[in-house]
């Protein structure tokens, strides 16, 4: 489950890896997004209190934040919170304000870093599930259906399956239980309901149901937190969504859920420990776990990556900065250009003059650029996550067939082989007669 939030860092217990890496990752986010061309806005957040007990929780969070080094924290009364966010409930008695919290496009955040790695020589082996791991004189042999990979060092960052991957080598010292979170994605007509991330007081199961703007002008609402046995269960439920809706209305009573355009769910990797698991196996030196990365995992990711580099250096691996580092090629965002810039781009490539996705003003040129990017998509959802085609109010009802045709043309495959998402999600069952 991912809310596209760059968390401030007041929630984790001081002294934990989670606390340190959350604050470090938050500080890194702005520079990374600016450098890689990722949509990001440091909008700030409010944690709401509706009773005296929750006011005490805010005080605890404030003290944690101070200990963790979170900048600019302030405790507000209810009137102060509503002065910032007029659509908050009159029942709000107090709030914790964290100006360093932000919102980001989570797919592009991850893709931009991955594409930069590919541009600089990293090879991705996608659709290659790990089936076995064995020790060798030189380190490890990782087996997949598409071949075997010899490595001196292995980093296990397999999300909710991290404990299962570790078990292919040896018994892991932890277990992971998936926790499902369900969401509403609201139309842009609701985007102005709040300008900051609105939290309720956190509990043991998570940071609670939030209401937040997105970098694309929508509103995201959710999630709940429900332990599920199936590590692939990302289905939504009537009961879960009803809970999210009821809880969110407590914070922002004016939300119009008739403007919902999409429901979805995701899974958090909840481990049997109360912290991120970032360590080398004692029994198998050279095998590292980066596991149990639940919230604030997205925020912490850049800092976790830096820690992985540090772990390798501690093993004596000589790592030098690449002298001819290649910057990521930024894709044009047609809707964000001025009229003069749009005209110049169309003169250069006429495909930018053909709008395919009307809801988000995404052009054929942008879709083609995504399909020929360093990590090209092969599905409608893959295109959507890279350039937003199909992300708007109609959710691909208008542009979906056109995007499908462009994918087939650019990849040189029959249109009936174009997928919606993962393997097997075919859109066309057979040719019409």
Explain the meaning of each model-derived region.
Residues 433:
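Conserved small/polar residues in nucleotide/adenosyl-binding loops
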Residues 357-359, 394, 399:
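Short cysteine clusters
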Residues 42, 76-78, 126-128, 144, ...:
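Short loop/edge segments at beta-strand edges and connector loops
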Residues 112, 202, 206, 215-216, ...:
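C-terminal catalytic lobe of FAD-dependent flavoproteins
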Residues 96-153:
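Helical element adjacent to the flavin cofactor pocket in flavoenzyme catalytic cores
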Residues 4-84, 93, 208-209:
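Dinucleotide-binding Rossmann-like beta1-alpha1 core, especially the glycine-rich loop
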Residues 133-222, 226-237, 246, 255, ...:
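Flavin-dependent oxidoreductases
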């Amino acid at each position: 489950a991912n809310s596209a939030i760059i968390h401030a860092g007041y929630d984790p217990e001081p002294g934990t890896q989670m606390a340190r890496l959350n604050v470090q990752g938050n500080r890194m986010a702005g520079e990374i997004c600016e450098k890689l061309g990722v949509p990001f806005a440091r909008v700030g957040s409010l944690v709401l209190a509706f009773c005296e007990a929750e006011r005490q929780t805010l005080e605890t969070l404030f003290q944690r934040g101070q200990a963790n080094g979170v900048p600019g924290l302030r405790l507000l009364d209810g009137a102060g919170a509503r002065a910032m966010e007029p659509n908050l409930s009159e029942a709000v008695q107090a709030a914790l304000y964290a100006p360093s919290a932000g919102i980001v496009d989570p797919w592009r955040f991850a893709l931009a870093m991955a594409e930069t790695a590919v541009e600089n020589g990293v090879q991705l082996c996608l659709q290659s599930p790990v089936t076995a791991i064995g020790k060798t004189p030189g380190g490890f042999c990782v087996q997949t259906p598409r071949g075997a990979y010899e490595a001196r060092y292995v980093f296990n960052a397999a999300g909710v399956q991290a404990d299962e991957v570790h078990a292919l080598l040896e018994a892991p010292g932890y277990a992971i239980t998936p926790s499902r979170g369900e969401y509403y994605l609201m139309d842009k007509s609701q985007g102005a309901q709040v300008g900051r991330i609105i939290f309720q007081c956190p509990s043991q199961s998570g940071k609670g149901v939030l209401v937040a703007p997105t970098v694309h002008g929508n509103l995201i609402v959710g999630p709940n937190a429900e332990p599920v046995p199936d590590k692939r269960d990302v289905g939504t439920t009537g009961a879960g969504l009803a809970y999210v809706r009821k809880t969110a209305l407590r914070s922002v009573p004016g939300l119009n859920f008739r403007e919902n355009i999409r429901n979805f769910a995701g899974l958090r990797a909840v481990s049997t420990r109360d912290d991120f698991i970032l360590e080398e196996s004692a029994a198998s030196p050279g095998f590292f776990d980066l596991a149990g990365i639940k919230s604030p995992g997205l925020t912490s990711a850049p800092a976790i990556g830096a820690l992985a580099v540090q772990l390798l250096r501690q093993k004596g691996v000589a790592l030098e900065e690449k002298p001819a580092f290649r910057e990521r090629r930024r894709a044009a965002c047609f809707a964000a250009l001025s009229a003069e810039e749009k005209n110049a781009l169309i003169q250069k490539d006429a495909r930018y003059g053909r709008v395919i996705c009307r809801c988000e003003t995404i052009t054929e040129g942008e879709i083609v650029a995504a399909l020929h990017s360093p990590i090209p998509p092969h599905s409608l959802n893959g295109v959507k996550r890279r350039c937003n085609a199909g992300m708007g109010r109609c959710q691909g009802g208008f542009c979906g067939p056109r995007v499908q045709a462009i994918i087939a043309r650019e990849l040189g495959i029959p249109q009936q082989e174009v997928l919606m998402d993962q393997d097997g999600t075919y859109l066309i069952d057979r040719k019409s007669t």
